[in-house]
């Protein structure tokens, strides 16, 4: 490559696709609850020369030389995330939320042990025991469900199942549950049966960091999370605990247990995101995320849609589309055609095939990052409603989205 030749002109195929993706993000409405937009600083750190450095091990205990700088980078990420969540110990090396969960399982329980987690169709996650996932293949899984009338987690049912099955681990956490989680109640039940309480806060980590959702750490033995979603960081995982002995076991499970060299450029980006989340303005952001989700839920109810559990306490809501004669797959296609991105969702006690889902999950982290507030949720609900009814609203979506710049 000559000094005058840029990477974009050398590999036009990839960089043209990157430009197309940037335009897709700019001109559309991103309502996938697990997606967000990072700051330019996060992207710059992730695209830095740190990607060149191999650093098996942990700060001060590496297998390779030349790690004195990345040691400081990783330690800064550790220190910041501990401050953010009030943790005594942290591991910032997991490549994803699922790999963080895998490390927790491998470190703390044995194959064949019983795990009590939220049923996927009721709002849980694949790694909480779904039979197609490692968690469902390696462990004996007992699923708890929401109350059929309130669609809230019924702690009396959780307690009954815990005493009946005596799990080694109880998982508190979800990927499509719109209400606050009572971590204190989960810990009380875990103590009654001698179980480890594992909190998966991947979706609500940013809300917890901002003080807008109860913190899991005073109650859970171990906490894992992604670093994107409501935290607005790069795609990756973290594990936290106030128990240093458990932390040491998990460190060994991450390395050398199942990962080799950590991605220090991603860890640097995590550190930047943690620093941003420690600023006062992040609290304002998290508060607005929730306000927007609640406003969006009300806007859909006003248009005749049923919102699962009747509303939301966090960043997401689930719409039941059965009364509209739609399922998640059909709705996703109609909205995609209008540059509105969402994810299909299963519904509690639904008979629709899990591949299609009876509803859709909507989240407000990304649109809030772009500066949208409650008044704009009415516009979004109107655009979605009309698109679901078969209208072409693509031009309106582009015009509306163009008013809100990406970070």
Curated annotation (Swiss-Prot):
<comment type="subunit">
    <text>Homodimer.</text>
</comment>
<dbReference type="InterPro" id="IPR015421">
    <property type="entry name" value="PyrdxlP-dep_Trfase_major"/>
</dbReference>
<dbReference type="InterPro" id="IPR001085">
    <property type="entry name" value="Ser_HO-MeTrfase"/>
</dbReference>
<comment type="function">
    <text>Catalyzes the reversible interconversion of serine and glycine with tetrahydrofolate (THF) serving as the one-carbon carrier. This reaction serves as the major source of one-carbon groups required for the biosynthesis of purines, thymidylate, methionine, and other important biomolecules. Also exhibits THF-independent aldolase activity toward beta-hydroxyamino acids, producing glycine and aldehydes, via a retro-aldol mechanism.</text>
</comment>
<dbReference type="InterPro" id="IPR019798">
    <property type="entry name" value="Ser_HO-MeTrfase_PLP_BS"/>
</dbReference>
<comment type="pathway">
    <text>Amino-acid biosynthesis; glycine biosynthesis; glycine from L-serine: step 1/1.</text>
</comment>
<keyword id="KW-0963">Cytoplasm</keyword>
<dbReference type="InterPro" id="IPR049943">
    <property type="entry name" value="Ser_HO-MeTrfase-like"/>
</dbReference>
<dbReference type="GO" id="GO:0004372">
    <property type="term" value="F:glycine hydroxymethyltransferase activity"/>
</dbReference>
<feature type="binding site">
    <location>
        <begin position="124"/>
        <end position="126"/>
    </location>
    <ligand>
        <name>(6S)-5,6,7,8-tetrahydrofolate</name>
    </ligand>
</feature>
<dbReference type="GO" id="GO:0019264">
    <property type="term" value="P:glycine biosynthetic process from serine"/>
</dbReference>
<dbReference type="Pfam" id="PF00464">
    <property type="entry name" value="SHMT"/>
</dbReference>
<dbReference type="InterPro" id="IPR039429">
    <property type="entry name" value="SHMT-like_dom"/>
</dbReference>
<feature type="site" description="Plays an important role in substrate specificity">
    <location>
        <position position="228"/>
    </location>
</feature>
<comment type="similarity">
    <text>Belongs to the SHMT family.</text>
</comment>
<keyword id="KW-0808">Transferase</keyword>
<dbReference type="GO" id="GO:0030170">
    <property type="term" value="F:pyridoxal phosphate binding"/>
</dbReference>
<protein>
    <recommendedName>
        <fullName>Serine hydroxymethyltransferase</fullName>
        <ecNumber>2.1.2.1</ecNumber>
    </recommendedName>
</protein>
<feature type="binding site">
    <location>
        <position position="120"/>
    </location>
    <ligand>
        <name>(6S)-5,6,7,8-tetrahydrofolate</name>
    </ligand>
</feature>
<dbReference type="GO" id="GO:0035999">
    <property type="term" value="P:tetrahydrofolate interconversion"/>
</dbReference>
<keyword id="KW-0028">Amino-acid biosynthesis</keyword>
<feature type="modified residue" description="N6-(pyridoxal phosphate)lysine">
    <location>
        <position position="229"/>
    </location>
</feature>
<keyword id="KW-0554">One-carbon metabolism</keyword>
<keyword id="KW-0663">Pyridoxal phosphate</keyword>
<comment type="pathway">
    <text>One-carbon metabolism; tetrahydrofolate interconversion.</text>
</comment>
<dbReference type="InterPro" id="IPR015422">
    <property type="entry name" value="PyrdxlP-dep_Trfase_small"/>
</dbReference>
<dbReference type="GO" id="GO:0005829">
    <property type="term" value="C:cytosol"/>
</dbReference>
<dbReference type="InterPro" id="IPR015424">
    <property type="entry name" value="PyrdxlP-dep_Trfase"/>
</dbReference>
């Amino acid at each position: 490559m000559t000094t005058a030749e840029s990477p974009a002109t050398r590999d036009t195929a990839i960089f043209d696709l990157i430009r197309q993706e940037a335009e897709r993000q700019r001109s559309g409405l991103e309502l996938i609850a697990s997606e967000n937009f990072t700051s330019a600083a996060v992207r710059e750190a992730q695209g830095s020369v740190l990607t060149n450095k191999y650093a098996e091990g942990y700060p001060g205990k590496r297998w390779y030389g030349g790690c004195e700088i990345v040691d400081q980078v990783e330690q800064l990420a550790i220190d910041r995330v501990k401050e953010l969540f009030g943790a005594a110990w942290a591991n910032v090396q997991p490549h994803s939320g699922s790999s963080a969960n895998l490390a927790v399982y491998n470190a703390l329980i044995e194959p064949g042990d019983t795990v009590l987690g939220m049923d996927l169709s009721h709002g849980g996650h694949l790694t909480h025991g779904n039979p197609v996932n490692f968690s469902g293949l390696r462990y004996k899984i007992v699923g708890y469900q929401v109350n059929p009338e309130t669609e809230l987690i019924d702690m009396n049912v959780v307690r009954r199942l815990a005493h009946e099955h005596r799990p080694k681990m109880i998982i508190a956490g979800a990927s499509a549950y719109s209400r606050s989680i009572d971590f204190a109640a989960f810990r009380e039940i875990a103590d009654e049966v001698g179980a480890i309480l594992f909190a998966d806060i991947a979706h609500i980590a940013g809300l917890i960091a901002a003080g807008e959702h109860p913190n899991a750490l005073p109650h859970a033995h171990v906490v894992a999370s992604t670093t994107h979603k409501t935290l607005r960081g790069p795609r990756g995982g973290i594990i936290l605990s106030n128990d240093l002995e458990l932390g040491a076991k998990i460190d060994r499970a991450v390395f050398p247990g199942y990962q080799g060299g950590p991605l220090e450029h991603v860890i640097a980006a995590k550190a930047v995101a943690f620093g941003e989340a420690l600023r006062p303005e992040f609290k304002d952001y998290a508060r607005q995320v929730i306000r927007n989700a609640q406003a969006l839920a009300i806007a859909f109810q006003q248009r005749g849609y049923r919102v699962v559990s009747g509303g939301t306490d966090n960043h997401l809501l689930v719409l039941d589309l059965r009364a509209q004669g739609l399922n998640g797959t059909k709705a996703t296609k109609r909205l995609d055609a209008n540059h509105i991105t969402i994810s299909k969702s299963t519904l509690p006690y639904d008979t629709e095939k899990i591949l299609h889902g009876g509803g859709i999950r909507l989240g407000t982290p990304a649109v809030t990052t772009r500066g949208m507030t409650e008044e704009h949720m009415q516009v979004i609900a109107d655009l979605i409603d009309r698109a679901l009814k078969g209208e072409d609203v693509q031009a309106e979506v582009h015009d509306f989205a163009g008013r809100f710049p990406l970070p």
